[in-house]
């Protein structure tokens, strides 16, 4: 994991008890501020290897803000400030000596709105490879493998040099997922990846998420509780910047422990 740290600076390892070895990410006492706005409050949460964790809650509850903190996307917002620790394989990802470029390769993100580059399908996939100095002779295999993992290869293999903007919305979103996979991440962050898609495209993205779990850890923000119940292993409910409850998805939806959770999933507020 030395690639995640800036050379010639020390990083203090965060030793974790063996009983927590299944957790690939461990957030502890995370507070996130935008100026004076306390957006996420004292959050602690383990994210387990090869699981799909869904983050649910009403708009403005802090779920996307927390998601963006995992690979330091909040660094791009001048007023943002994050405190606490976010441990990933022994490193505190919030430390100043973390190489953020390497981090975003290791922990990739796919956004709500598909954002393919205005280039060919092929160039979308090799853009990151070129940036990270991956040998050119490896590109073709990586492109094919990534598109297959994103369940898109059969649909585009004969048009790789056509514009990515010619793809349908669902195909564009799967291309963005393939673009992330090309960099061989360990964790994939999905911020409402299907909210702008039709039901058929949504179903394909959901099927893809379940398939990805075999090789990756997936954290997905969704307003769609049915989607969370279909694809996730565990669900975390956020409200007013706080993590209210986290549990196995079927347990949380059938028998929530907190009244706020029950009120939200039953539609009493949202």
From Swiss-Prot:
CDD domains: ABC_PstB_phosphate_transporter. InterPro entries: AAA+_ATPase, ABC_transporter-like_ATP-bd, ABC_transporter-like_CS, P-loop_NTPase, PstB-like. ATP binds at residues 57-64. GO terms for molecular function: ATP binding; ATP hydrolysis activity; ATPase-coupled phosphate ion transmembrane transporter activity. SUPFAM superfamilies: P-loop containing nucleoside triphosphate hydrolases (SSF52540). It comes from the Bacteria. It is a peripheral membrane protein. Its EC number is 7.3.2.1. Keywords: ATP-binding, Cell membrane, Membrane, Nucleotide-binding, Phosphate transport, Translocase, Transport. NCBIfam families: 3a0107s01c2. This is Phosphate import ATP-binding protein PstB 2. The lineage of its organism: Bacteria, Bacillati, Bacillota, Bacilli, Bacillales. The gene is pstB2.
């Amino acid at each position: 994991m030395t690639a995640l740290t800036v050379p010639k600076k020390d990083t203090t390892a965060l030793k974790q008890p063996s009983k927590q070895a299944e957790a690939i990410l461990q957030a502890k006492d995370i507070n996130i501020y935008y100026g004076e706005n306390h957006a996420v409050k004292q959050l602690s949460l383990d994210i387990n290897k090869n699981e799909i964790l869904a983050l649910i809650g009403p708009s403005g509850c802090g779920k996307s803000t927390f998601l963006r903190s995992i690979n330091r996307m909040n660094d791009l917002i001048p007023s943002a400030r994050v405190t606490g620790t976010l441990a990933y394989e022994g490193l505190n990802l919030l430390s100043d000596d973390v190489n953020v470029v390497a981090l975003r390769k290791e922990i990739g993100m796919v956004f709500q709105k598909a954002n393919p580059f205005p280039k060919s399908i092929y160039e979308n996939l090799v853009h990151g490879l070129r940036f990270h100095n991956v040998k050119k002779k490896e590109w073709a295999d990586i492109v094919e493998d990534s598109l297959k993992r994103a369940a898109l290869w059969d649909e585009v293999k004969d048009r790789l040099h056509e514009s990515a903007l010619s793809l349908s919305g669902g195909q564009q979103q799967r291309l963005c997922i393939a673009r992330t996979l090309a960099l061989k991440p360990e964790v994939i962050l999905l911020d409402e990846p299907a909210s702008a898609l039709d039901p058929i495209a949504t179903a394909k993205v959901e099927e893809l998420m379940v398939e990805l779990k075999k090789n990756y850890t997936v954290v997905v923000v969704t307003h769609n509780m049915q989607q969370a119940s279909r694809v996730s292993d565990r669900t975390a409910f956020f409200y007013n910047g706080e993590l209210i409850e986290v549990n196995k998805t079927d347990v949380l939806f059938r028998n929530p422990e907190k009244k706020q959770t029950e009120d939200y999933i039953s539609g009493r507020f949202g």
